[in-house]
């Protein structure tokens, strides 16, 4: 699947509903918005003078008798693009149909694309030989990704080798994150435990409300994680975090070739690593990019920004109860007001195919006694 890098402006028509596409949508910068939304839970001690992170929702006063009914909620982050990669903006709640195991669901919550973003930049930074190279590529965040973020958005920076480190905790100051990237000089260990890093990061995000994503910049190679790929995927399916992957194996191999030294890098199974990155993104509703040259990085990050800025957040409570411990397949469709499939046309009236990006399913919890 190719990267979303199209620049051509199009128009979208659904029955009598006009949904104009954002011009240069994959590369457009989002306007700076006002301060909004509560920040995500802090991972480290924050400056007491800075804006405080939110606490969990306050509990209501306890009555004499309380009956608690746990209702499972499934949250989806959805992006829709044309076949040429143009983002389809302006969609409303009634333009989405969600099928859970083929059964239509009622969407209970809907957030448009201007909702605040909570994002973790997760960077592989090992001494295997390419950690510094990856950190160098991470500097493209300043010129390509950060300008598209709004003041209300929250960003954190994490790195990983054999363990995961929080370099910059959640902040709305993007310069602080950029300084954290610039201060990455000498990688420590040679391991790259990407499975563990992903699961630790997802766990930190579990209490964050709203749109939340991980942008993973890595080779995709896992060395000595405590978790297997199957265990990792099972937990990712239970989360509501969208993962966007930028696989850097090809870029590093080309960089090393041009500089006369590959060494043991040729023996590494980059094909398997890329397949793992594709799986992370595809199953969580994200996308994976695999640039071959460093010159492609700004455009790739602009595409990442387009996805992040144009996500729709949908929630529903499965009609089945979804506490059977099984994997449930999800399909998200775009529909016109009359329930027919959404029709997309360009400015010349030519019908366009489109793609909906959303997680493919979720791992339902296992109901216990009394559920």
Model regions and ranges:
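Bacterial N-terminal signal peptides
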Residues: 11-23
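Scaffold/interface architecture of coatomer-like assemblies
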Residues: 27-371
């Amino acid at each position: 699947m190719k990267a979303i890098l199209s620049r051509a402006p199009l128009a979208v028509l659904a029955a009598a509903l006009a949904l104009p596409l954002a011009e240069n949508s994959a590369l457009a910068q989002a306007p700076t918005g006002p301060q909004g939304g509560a920040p995500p839970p802090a991972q480290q001690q924050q400056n007491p003078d800075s804006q405080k992170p939110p606490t969990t929702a306050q509990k209501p006063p306890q009555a004499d008798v309380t009956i608690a009914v746990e209702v499972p909620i499934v949250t989806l982050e959805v992006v829709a693009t044309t076949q040429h990669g143009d983002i389809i903006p302006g969609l409303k709640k009634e333009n989405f149909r969600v099928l859970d195991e083929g059964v239509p669901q009622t969407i209970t919550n809907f957030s448009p694309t201007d909702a605040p973003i909570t994002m973790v930049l997760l960077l592989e930074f090992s001494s295997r030989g390419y950690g510094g190279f990856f950190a160098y590529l991470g500097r493209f965040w300043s010129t390509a990704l950060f300008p598209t973020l709004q003041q209300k958005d929250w960003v954190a920076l994490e790195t990983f080798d054999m363990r995961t480190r929080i370099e910059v905790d959640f902040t709305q100051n993007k310069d602080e994150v950029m300084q954290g990237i610039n201060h990455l000089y000498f990688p420590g260990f040679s391991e790259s435990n990407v499975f563990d890093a992903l699961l630790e990061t997802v766990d930190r995000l579990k209490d964050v409300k709203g749109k939340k994503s991980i942008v993973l910049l890595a080779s995709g190679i896992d060395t000595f994680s405590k978790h297997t790929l199957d265990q990792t995927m099972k937990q990712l399916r239970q989360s509501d975090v969208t993962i966007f992957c930028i696989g850097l194996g090809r870029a590093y191999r080309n960089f090393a070739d041009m500089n006369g030294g590959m060494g043991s890098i040729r023996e590494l199974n980059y094909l398997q690593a890329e397949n793992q990155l594709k799986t992370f993104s595809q199953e969580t509703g994200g996308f994976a990019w695999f640039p071959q040259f460093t010159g492609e990085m700004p455009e790739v990050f602009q595409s990442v920004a387009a996805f992040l800025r144009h996500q729709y957040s949908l929630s529903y409570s499965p009609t089945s109860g979804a506490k059977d411990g099984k994997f449930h397949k999800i399909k998200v469709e775009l529909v016109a007001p009359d329930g027919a499939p959404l029709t997309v046309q360009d400015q010349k009236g030519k019908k366009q195919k489109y793609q909906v990006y959303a997680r493919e399913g979720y791992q339902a919890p296992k109901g216990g006694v009394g559920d």
